[in-house]
Amino acid sequence: MAAEEKDPLSYFAAYGSSSSDSESSDEEKEAERSKNRSIKRPFPTDTKKLPGPDELFRNVSRPAFLYNPLNKQIDWESRVKRAPEEPPKEFKVWKTNAVPPPESYQVAEKKAPPPELDMAIKWSNVYQDNGDDAPHANQAKSLEEEEAREDSPPSDDEQEKAFAIKKRKV
């Protein structure tokens, strides 16, 4: 029965190899594995490893071009490269149709509309109703003048004119 049982990982094994081979021994398998390991390593183990950081910084010196011979310090000011300065740009106001903020907003003063005729006068002219009772634009009077006339007694000429006008209406 042992020969009939299969290794569950044998499905993933390479083609043509089987785990049920009883011919190969454990020693032979270990020999093959050691050969495969030696083939996978590209670098031989005899090479020297890189030095550690402490050892490296003890041995490495700074390049001579960074030093000022008088001070023995790095002259960073002579090494600095600065971009050329551009002239300041002029501020240009964008032209938009947006409503300006309330602080800068000034109401544009509009011209007053032309004085319109009284609608009664306009309609009487349209329909040519220019009788005695038709309104006239030039007869507009202020209240002060009317009050002054009411206070004073009417003269004879004014009474006759008023009487003649009343006769015409009737």
UniProtKB/Swiss-Prot annotation:
One Pfam family per UniProt: DUF4660
Originating organism: Xenopus tropicalis
Ranges for region Disordered: 1-56, 124-170
Protein family according to the UniProt entry: Belongs to the UPF0690 family.
Bias (Basic and acidic residues): 46-56
TM segment ranges: none
Descriptive protein name: UPF0690 protein C1orf52 homolog
Signal sequence bounds: none
Residue ranges with Acidic residues bias: 144-159
